[in-house]
């Protein structure tokens, strides 16, 4: 295994507020999927050239973190030190979901795509706050999703927007009307898998990881065909040999005071715990278009509070991992903390 040592508002002076209303979230709403289209959203086809050049695009926000480098750096100068103190709310948009919002809007030619908890998607006029369309996902029987019902946003590619769902699906919607085009089951939600991260669109593929590290899942990052929803590749964030090198120091050189002898005895007794070791990925990967590499950070091992039953370094938890964009093949990794 190789080590990774290095890795490489929009519509003007506008402040907006998007919030929930007092409408309760009921079971019948979870079981009903529907798209309400007030009028089609006037959006252009979002090309790969546009997505690749997002870092210098001061008109749109085409990625959750503004660009493939995930820097959140915006080069526009319309809002600056001299006028930021004068900004005032321009409009308020009320959703029908009473939960927190942890989403980043995607903005294309003045059309703002916003997600809410429990997998609603709204297309909104960024200038007026008026709704173009509203999609409600039909939720399956989910009882084990981790850490709340939040959703962190959509990806956009050509004429579609993409969202991961709490019941571990990837859905593709018509960017103009919100109509469901296809949906793909990513994993079994009853085994603890769920989706809250925003997908990433690149080179005709939709990249997405998974939640569920607290439920003993085996984490992954997967690529799906943007047109059909078919699986292109799968990378397990926990390899079949998760033991590693029995590291005694973390990435900063600090002694972790591991009892290696006790861990090796546990390995002999319990075996490699790779099938239930966790390793979720819920933040967007960085993409290097020149080298065709995808970089992502893998989360905690499972169970997170009892390391005695997961001997070894617990690869690739608590690590930065790089894979090939076209194939999903392992390139390198750097583990910050072994056996966390």
Model-derived regions, located:
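Repeat-blade elements of multi-bladed beta-propeller folds
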Residues: 61-65, 100-120, 145-169, 194-218, ...
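Extracytoplasmic beta-rich repeat domains
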Residues: 93-104, 134-155, 183-198, 236-284, ...
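Short loop/turn segments that connect beta-strands within beta-propeller blades
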Residues: 125-128, 174-177, 226-228, 325-327
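Bacterial N-terminal signal peptides that target proteins for export
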Residues: 1-11
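Boundary at the C-terminal end of the N-terminal hydrophobic targeting segment
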Residues: 22-26
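Bacterial N-terminal signal peptides
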Residues: 10-20
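Beta-propeller domains
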Residues: 76-86, 116-137, 312, 325
């Amino acid at each position: 295994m190789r080590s990774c040592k290095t890795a490489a508002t929009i519509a003007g002076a506008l402040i907006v507020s998007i919030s929930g209303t007092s409408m309760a979230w009921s079971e019948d709403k979870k079981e009903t999927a529907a798209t309400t289209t007030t009028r089609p959203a006037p959006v252009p086809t979002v090309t790969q050239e546009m997505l690749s050049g997002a870092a210098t695009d001061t008109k749109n926000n085409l990625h959750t973190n503004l660009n493939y480098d995930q820097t959140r750096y915006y080069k526009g100068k319309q809002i600056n030190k001299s006028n930021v103190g004068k900004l005032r709310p321009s409009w308020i948009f009320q959703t029908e979901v009473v939960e927190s919002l942890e989403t980043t809007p995607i903005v294309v030619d003045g059309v703002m795509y916003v997600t809410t908890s429990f997998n609603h998607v709204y297309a909104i006029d960024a200038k007026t706050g008026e709704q173009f369309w509203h999609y409600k996902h039909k939720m399956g029987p989910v009882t084990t999703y981790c850490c709340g019902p939040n959703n962190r946003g959509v990806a956009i590619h050509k004429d579609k927007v993409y969202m991961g769902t709490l019941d571990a699906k990837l859905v593709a919607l018509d960017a103009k009307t919100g109509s469901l085009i296809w949906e793909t089951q990513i994993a079994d939600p009853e085994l603890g898998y769920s989706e809250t991260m925003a997908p990433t669109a690149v080179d005709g593929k939709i990249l997405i990881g998974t939640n569920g590290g607290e439920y003993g899942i085996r984490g992954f990052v997967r690529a799906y065909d943007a047109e059909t929803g078919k699986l292109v590749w799968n990378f397990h964030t926990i390899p079949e040999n998760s033991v590693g090198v029995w590291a005694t120091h973390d990435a900063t050189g600090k002694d972790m005071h591991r009892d290696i002898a006790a861990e090796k005895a546990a390995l002999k007794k319990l075996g490699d715990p790779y099938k239930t070791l966790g390793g979720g990925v819920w933040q967007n990967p960085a993409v290097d278009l020149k080298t065709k590499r995808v970089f992502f950070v893998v989360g905690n091992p499972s169970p997170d509070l009892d390391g005695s039953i997961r001997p070894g370094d617990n690869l690739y938890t608590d690590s930065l991992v790089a894979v090939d964009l076209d194939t999903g093949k392992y390139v390198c990794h750097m583990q910050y903390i072994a056996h966390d």
